[in-house]
Amino acid sequence: MNKEWSEQNKKLQMLIKKADTFDQGKDVLFELRNDLMNTLLSFRKDLNREDFDSMPFMNADGYHSKNIAYSIWHIFRIEDIVAHTLIKGDDEVLFSGNYQRRINSPVITTGNELVKEQISDFTKQLNIDELYSYIADVKKSTEEIIRSLTYSDLKLGIPD
């Protein structure tokens, strides 16, 4: 998957650089996003709750010290914040869908401030079914935003 992913990513980067292939680039992006979501959905099907919270490398440096539930939360919080706060300027899915309560998350951030046992304590509180509902809604809303973007939008800056 890594080689295929890398090739698709190169194709995406090439296509979005030109106005006449920009929409094809978005199609490649959607394919990559679907591949990622299918992998995450296979985790939901194949793993048990303990697997989502397991931290076998808690004392390692970098991303190896995290767990699956945290990684899913972290990635989709970043996407939600960027898509809605920075690009569209509207309410994040976390808030509009009342997901903080539904997921039972004590934080609204990406979780960067959490380390070691804090990550483990955090993810043990999460409702995994609702986390998966959240990521599906974030994916859907982000893709609606992406579909609306034009090549000329790439030249726009982020408003203050």
Predicted segments, located by residue:
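Aromatic-glycine hotspot motif
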Residues: 1-69, 78-160
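Histidine-centered divalent metal-coordination motifs
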Residues: 74
